Amino acid sequence: MKRLTVHLIPHTHWDREWYLTSAGFTVRLADALDRVLALLERDPSLRFHLDGQAVLVEDYLAVRPDARPRLEALARTGRLAIGPWYVLADELIPGGESLIRNLLIGRRVAGAAGGRCLTLYCPDAFGHPGIGPDLAAEFGLTAAVVWRGVGAAAGHRDRFRWTGRGKTSLVVLHLPPAGYEIGIGLVDDPADLATAWGRLRSEFAERATTDHVAVFIGADHHEPSDRLIGLPDRLAAIDARSSFRFSTLDE
């Protein structure tokens, strides 16, 4: 059995308006980020990825202004990953100037909150422009994560190098077919943890380019589960050949 170093990435994916109004989703966001801050303060090993879009910080602090010091303290330590986008972008419909402005504002908002994620996070776009690596380089972004818009043919590995129109390139992590929800089963019924991990392990080992794999734990509009606490230790007890830790994308 191949030894793996497993990076657990707690996160959420957030549409600001969809099957609820923007006001309805803002109420849910406030509750979700209340829980995020509480769990991060409870467990110093925990990390949380805030969906790559800094606007969620603005939305949250608009209704929870008293939470600013706590949020900024966690962002400064890198445990709460914010940005680099202002809002997650459709990368093909908007013009290049729109994408640049998006990243400019994201850098400002994330920086003001305490820190910026340096990974170009593009999980939900249905295509990616040829200038992607060049755009990332201009903003000091050192890697990328994509899901849709790449393809998922059998045999695809989990990493590739994306070369832009010039000589710029960056390493890309391509999420598995189940995308950013693939690890949500790890915080469901504890009695099923061994089965859930066994199923995921086989899939990740088959696609892995190196012995490091990233398992996203979250879903659309989901709050983080209390079962995140202690999850690396529970998984290590099941799979003693591998190591488990909470990580951010930059880590």
Q: Over which residues does each language-model region extend?
A:
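Catalytic-domain carbohydrate-binding cleft regions of carbohydrate-active enzymes
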Residues: M1-E251
